[in-house]
């Protein structure tokens, strides 16, 4: 049982809850049907992002012990910004816009199948993945669910070998307080290989 909802009231511990240097996300590989590097894929990615109420997840799943995403880095790094100038709206919950974008994508190619997020069951990710998938399912009216793997290495091997057939949980913890330590290892073209 998680103590995330009670640790602040526990007199046997000194409670500490500040912004950290790690983050959790999920990645949708371009090779998945409906998510290529084309207009349909871009619309679906935007719709999924806008279908997620990050504030609600932080409140309900983490009892306000996390910080909702507003940037590609952490509040601990000097380059952190609270609002991205370009595409920052993609990180804000907007169910009506998400539905509109999904409908536009369906006009290009009708949705088929399901949406899954793979995660390692040994790492405490079930709650947030389930919450994200429920929000996507309820907003976009599609079959969305988490797909548990027993261990981190089970998921990571498929990701590394590029054989995973679903979106997958990702995370990062910086080594030193610089935006480069987030951006280069995660988003540079060279980091994919």
Regions from the language model: what does each represent?
Residues 1, 103-174:
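Ligand/substrate-recognition segments at binding pockets and active sites
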Residues 3, 40-44, 53-57, 69, ...:
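Stable alpha-helical elements in mature extracytoplasmic
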Residues 3-17, 164, 178-193:
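Ligand-binding "clamshell"
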Residues 4-8, 26-27, 35-37, 124-128, ...:
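Extracytoplasmic/secreted cell-surface and envelope-processing proteins
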Residues 8-12, 33, 49-66, 78, ...:
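Sec-exported extracytoplasmic/periplasmic mature domains
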Residues 10, 21-70, 113-123:
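Alpha-helical secondary-structure segments
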Residues 35, 67-105, 122-127:
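Structural transition elements
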Residues 43-46, 58-61, 91, 143-155, ...:
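Extracytoplasmic/peripheral linker and loop segments enriched in polar/acidic and small residues
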